[in-house]
Every structure is written in C-alpha cells, then in structure tokens.
C-alpha cells in the first residue's frame, strides 16, 4: 500500500514514474488489482493502471503480473465451471492494429467494454448459478443476488437447455445519480453490493444493478450469433455494431461516441473477429482485443535544461524543448524530475523526448527517444545528496534565489498579506535580506524601496506588523525553514502537543533525554529526531534574535490529553466532515482514509452497509457507527 499512497500523493503518476522500479510497480498493480476485483474499490484510475503495466513491460517483460487474470478471491471461493479470461489490449497504435487485422479477415463486432463487475451465469439441469470472475479459475458464488438485482428470473426459467453466459453487473449512469453523494463511482457501488454477505445486502441498492450479457460460452457460435441468442432469450445485451473493416481512427471515433452516448460507464471498446472460434481455456483470446484509446503524446527536441534552486538549495531541473502543439495547446517546458533522471537518461541539448499532457493539463516526459551526448548539468558548484538523487548548491545560504524563496515562505507562513516573491525580491535587492532585518523595517524603510509609494509602503508595513502581533512558536518553527525538508506544521504540532516548552527547555546536556522522548511520538523515527534536534540550537539562536523585536506567543495545544478519542483512529466512509475531524483530533484521536487493523471506529452513512470499507471493518471486527448515531452521540 505504500506505493499506492505515494502515487495518490503525487500531482501525477508521470511525476513519480521515473522513481518506481519493477518491484514497486508489481506491488502497486497487485494491490490495486486485489482491491478492484474483491472490493470493487479503484485505488488508482484505469489510465494509471495501464501506464504502470506499460512501464513494467519495459522494466521486466517476463513479470508474473502479465499472466494474472483478475485477482484471487478473498473468503469462500468456488471452482468456476469455465475459464473466465480477460482481454489483450491494443493502444492507438496503427502498426499493432494492422498486424491484428492481417490475422483476422472479419467482419468485426465492436462492442462496449462495460466498467462493472464481470460475472458468469450458468444453467445446468434447470439449476441457475451466478459467479464472480475472481482470478479466472476460482470465483465467488453470488447466486443469492439473482433475486435482488434488476433481472427477470422468469426469463431464465424459460431457457430449456444448459447454458453458460458471461455478463457484467453494472449500475446505469441514471440509477447512480441518487448515490453519487455517498459513493465515488458506480463500479465501487456495485462492488460493495457483490462483496456484501447475503444477509447484509441492501435490497434497494441491489435493485438498481443491471446484468448486461456479452458472451455465450455454451453453446458456442460466432459472436454476432451469440448476441442474437441472448436477445432472443429476452436478456439485456451489450451495445454493439458490426463492421466490415476499421482502422485506428474509426476505433477512436467509436470510443469517443460511445463514452458520450452509453447509458453505462465504459472503459473502452471490445473488437472481436466475427467468426466461430474455439474458446480458449487459459490466457486471453487472440481473436479479440480491448481498445481504450491513447493519451496523445508527441516527440520533441530538448533545447536546454534550466536549473533553479529551491528554498532548501536543491537544484530543480526544468526542461525547455522545441515548442509543440498537443491537445490544442502550445507546450515548451516540462519538469526534469531530479538530477538523477537527467543524468541517467542523458537529457541535454539535442535529446529527443516524448511528452504527454497528464490529465490534459501538465506536460510530462513519458520516455527518452534519443539521449543527448551528455546530460545538461549546471555550471555552478553543487554536491549530490546522500541518496544520489538530487544535487544541492555547495553554498546554499549565500544564493540570492534561495534567500528570496525562504523569505517569501516566511512571509506566507506567518500570514503577512501582499508580500509576494516580487516584493521580497525588491527587499533583498535593497539590502533587507534576512528575517530580522525585514521585521525591524519601519514604514520609512519601505519608502526607500524602488517602486514603493506611500500607500504601498503603509500597506505592506501594516500587514507585516499585524502578522507579527499574532505570531506563535508553532508558526515561527514552520516559517523559519531552519529544520529543512520534511518538517512542517503537522510534525511541529505533534511535538508541541506533548512538549510545548521544548524550545526553552532543550540543551545539549539533555539531548539524549529529549531523543528518547521524541522517539515515543507516533511517526517519529531516528532520522527525523536526529534532524530535528540537530537543528534545535540554530533555531534557539534565531528565536532569541526574533524575540528581542517581537513577543512570540507560546503554543497552546487544543488537544485534550484525556480526550474521549485518545489514541484512537477513526475512518469516515461515504462522506467528509471537517468539523468532526477537528473534534476527533482535539479529543486525542486521528482521522484516516483507509480501514486497517489499527482502525478503532468506522463511521458510515445510514443504510450503506454494502460499502467496501464497511465490509472490511466487519471482517476485522472493528466497531462501526452510523453517521446519524455519531451525530446524536457527539454533537451538542
């Protein structure tokens, strides 16, 4: 789950993809697949899943991940009477599509790829069964849902032969509208229903689930005939059309149209050769493939790498390339991630890179098509960090860009309005290049700054003084930037909640005592504690200087040390409530986004016992409470 959390925290998967190795990607794919197929929960998007699969093919083409179908069933499982495979995927790649077309002469059935829960329905000796796909070999028996979901059982009873048919349990866009406030998407909704125990299924919710069929396994025939048989039986059938031929452009057009017009969520289209084929008993059929389209990318030539120091002195690469137009937008810059990426991929003038617009917003490099002769590194002194990932200015404290960024951060963090990086730059250029110098500035001093008129000088001065009047030790620790990367309000708050006077009480002689105390705080390891205490003497010196000019207010913890949620972890599902989160934290607890063995309480929407988090909480024996019960008990 650590890799999944890393992906979720990133602005875009492309931003962290270069840092993931094959093992990382296999973990992310395995965990997300397990959640997707066993709980109905999508930890990552379909696009992110496909990107990770493509990257894994580059790093480890023989990975076991590529042989997996679905995910192993959790809980009671049954052997499926027929193999339930998946589909090979082809992107918007003209060569790959043409290669497939050369093998299969058509005609072709193009149908919707429904984004629901894959299942198998069988009738044998007049006995009807319904199964989930599971891992293709073993699934769950969910026959109990047949009397609850939106399917006419009478139609099945009229079928007077043994059959095996595949379909998708899915909720229509229209039906899902009533649930969109409590569930992220229709698939998660259906997944929760499917994974509920028979006695816990919400019947009203289940009644909104359709079963759409798309394959007749037994009796076998060409696909168009299979779909016709399903219609003759009166069952709901996937949307499809028959084509004499097609190309990539037609597939893109069909996909775009179906995403707009389909009454159900689809995550692609399925292309099948419309001739009779021997059904495969393992792997995926060669005569069909899934087409999901492709995120537009384009090759371009690197002009240079621009290195800019961060407030911590880390030199951050930004790549300027020959201007290109992608998705109707002109692009000429992208992130270079870090120095290691630039060096490993030899990115410099003349390199050819492939660029994608992530989410149609930010451009990222997907891969390097042709490296430069050598990487484009900065012409200033720098050192590598201990991990060999970033390069850092050799002389951080005297770099003007670093000084400006640190001062800007200080002003922003203390709440000094209108003191932007532009204003800070002018102050530094005028010689006011330290925090003590700036907080001691008079209104007359501001008037000496180039471009400052009386009104602006008065405004900036008053805003600064107002923020300094309310400055407490927590804000000062965060704004100072003395403790460096990895430290922010949350970590400082954790320390001050327990030891509010640590700044005044710490001495070198008591270092070992404080080290033991801080290691007892949740989330603090040896590296964090060593870094914090290592910088404490520097912060104490800074604090004394600042305290001569203004009075720093002490930190007053809002946390009740004997609170009713002391050392407890609460999870909300189906809703968010900032006031309740603050209440729980002030009472000594914390709010998490996922259910685990460390969860103390799950609060869920009334009637939402079918949600994946609720089911997991019950499996782990975690206490649960409805939203209305929580409100009645704790809101006054």
Swiss-Prot record:
CDD domains tied to this protein:
BRCT_DNA_ligase_like
Q: Which PROSITE patterns match?
A: BRCT (PS50172)
What's the superkingdom here? Viruses
**InterPro entries membership:** BRCT_dom (IPR001357), BRCT_dom_sf (IPR036420), DNA_ligase (IPR001679), DNA_repair_Rad51/TF_NusA_a-hlx (IPR010995), DNAligase_adenylation (IPR013839), DNAligase_N (IPR013840), NA-bd_OB-fold (IPR012340), NAD_DNA_ligase_OB (IPR004150)
Domain (BRCT): residue spans on this chain = 560-636
Give the residues annotated as active site: 113
Identify the Gene3D superfamilies for this entry. Answer: 5' to 3' exonuclease, C-terminal subdomain, BRCT domain, DNA ligase/mRNA capping enzyme, Helix hairpin bin, Nucleic acid-binding proteins
Pfam families (alphabetical)? BRCT, DNA_ligase_aden, DNA_ligase_OB
Alphabetical keyword list = DNA replication, Ligase, NAD
Catalytic activity as recorded in UniProt:
NAD(+) + (deoxyribonucleotide)n-3'-hydroxyl + 5'-phospho-(deoxyribonucleotide)m = (deoxyribonucleotide)n+m + AMP + beta-nicotinamide D-nucleotide
What SUPFAM superfamilies does the record tag this protein with? BRCT domain, DNA ligase/mRNA capping enzyme, catalytic domain, Nucleic acid-binding proteins, Rad51 N-terminal domain-like
Effect on the protein of changing residue 50 to A: No effect on nick sealing activity in vitro. Complete loss of ligase adenylation activity in vitro
One annotated GO biological process: DNA repair
Q: Which residues cross the membrane?
A: none
The EC number(s) attached to this protein equal 6.5.1.2
Q: Which GO terms describe its molecular function?
A: DNA ligase (NAD+) activity; nucleotide binding
Family to which this protein belongs: Belongs to the NAD-dependent DNA ligase family.
By what name is this protein known?
DNA ligase
Species in which this protein is naturally found: Acanthamoeba polyphaga mimivirus (APMV)
């Amino acid at each position: 789950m650590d890799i999944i959390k890393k992906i979720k925290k990133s602005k875009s998967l492309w931003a962290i993809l270069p840092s993931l190795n094959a093992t990382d990607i296999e973990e992310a794919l395995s965990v997300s697949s397990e959640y997707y197929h066993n709980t109905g929960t999508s930890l990552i998007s379909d696009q992110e899943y496909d990107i990770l699969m493509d990257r894994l093919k580059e790093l480890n083409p023989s990975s076991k991940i590529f042989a997996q179908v679905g995910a192993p069933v959790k809980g009671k499982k049954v052997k499926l009477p027929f193999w339930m495979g998946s589909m090979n995927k082809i992107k918007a790649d003209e060569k790959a599509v043409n290669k497939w077309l050369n093998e299969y002469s058509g005609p072709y059935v193009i149908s919707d790829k429904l984004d629901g829960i894959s299942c198998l329905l069988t009738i044998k000796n007049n006995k009807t069964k319904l199964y989930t796909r599971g891992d293709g070999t073993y699934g769950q028996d969910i026959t109990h849902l047949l009397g609850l979901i939106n399917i006419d059982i009478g139609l099945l009873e009229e079928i007077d032969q043994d059959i095996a048919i595949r379909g998708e349990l899915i909720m229509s866009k229209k039906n899902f509208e009533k649930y969109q406030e409590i569930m992220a998407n229709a698939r998660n909704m259906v997944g929760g229903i499917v994974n509920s125990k028979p006695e816990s299924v919400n019947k009203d919710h289940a009644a909104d689930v359709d079963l759409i069929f798309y394959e007749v396994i037994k009796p076998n025939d060409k696909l168009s005939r299979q779909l016709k048989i399903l219609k003759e039986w009166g069952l709901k059938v996937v949307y499809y059309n028959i084509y004499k031929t097609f190309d990539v452009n037609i597939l893109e057009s069909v996909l775009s149209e179906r995403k707009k017009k389909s009454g159900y969520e689809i995550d692609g289209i399925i292309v099948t050769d419309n001739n009779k084929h021997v059904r495969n008993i393992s792997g995926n059929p060669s005569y069909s493939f899934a087409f999901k389209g492709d995120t537009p990318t384009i090759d371009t030539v690197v002009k240079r790498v621009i290195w800019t120091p961060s407030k911590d002195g880390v030199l951050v690469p930004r790549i300027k390339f020959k201007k290109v137009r992608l998705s109707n937008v002109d692009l000429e810059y992208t992130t270079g991630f870090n120095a290691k990426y630039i060096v490993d991929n030899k990115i410099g003038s003349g390199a050819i890179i492939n660029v994608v617009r992530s989410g149609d917003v930010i451009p990222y490099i997907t891969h390097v098509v042709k490296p430069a002769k050598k990487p484009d590194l900065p012409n200033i002194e720098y050192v590598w960090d201990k991990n060999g990932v970033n390069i850092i200015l050799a002389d951080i404290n005297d770099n003007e860009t670093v000084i400006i960024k640190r001062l800007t951060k200080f002003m922003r963090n203390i709440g000094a309005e209108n003191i932007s990086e532009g204003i800070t730059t002018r102050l530094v250029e005028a010689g006011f290049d330290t925090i003590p110098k700036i907080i001691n500035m008079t209104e007359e001093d501001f008037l000496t700054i180039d471009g400052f008129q009386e009104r602006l000088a008065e405004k900036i001065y008053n805003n600064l003084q107002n923020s300094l009047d309310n400055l407490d030790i927590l804000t000062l620790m965060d704004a100072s930037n003395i403790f460096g990367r990895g430290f922010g309000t949350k970590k400082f708050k954790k320390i001050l909640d327990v030891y509010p006077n640590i700044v005044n009480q710490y001495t070198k002689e008591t270092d070992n005592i404080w080290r033991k105390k801080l290691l007892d705080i949740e989330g603090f390891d040896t590296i964090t504690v060593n870094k914090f205490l290592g910088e404490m003497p520097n912060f104490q010196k800074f604090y004394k200087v600042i305290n001569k000019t203004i009075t720093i207010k002490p930190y007053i913890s809002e946390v009740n040390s004997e609170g009713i949620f002391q050392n407890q972890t609460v999870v909300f599902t189906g809703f968010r409530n900032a006031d309740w989160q603050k209440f729980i934290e002030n009472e000594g607890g914390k709010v998490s986004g996922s259910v685990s063995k460390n969860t103390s309480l799950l609060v869920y929407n009334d009637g939402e016992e079918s949600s994946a988090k609720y089911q997991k909480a019950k499996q782990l024996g975690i206490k649960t409470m409805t939203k209305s019960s929580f409100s009645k008990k704790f809101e006054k």
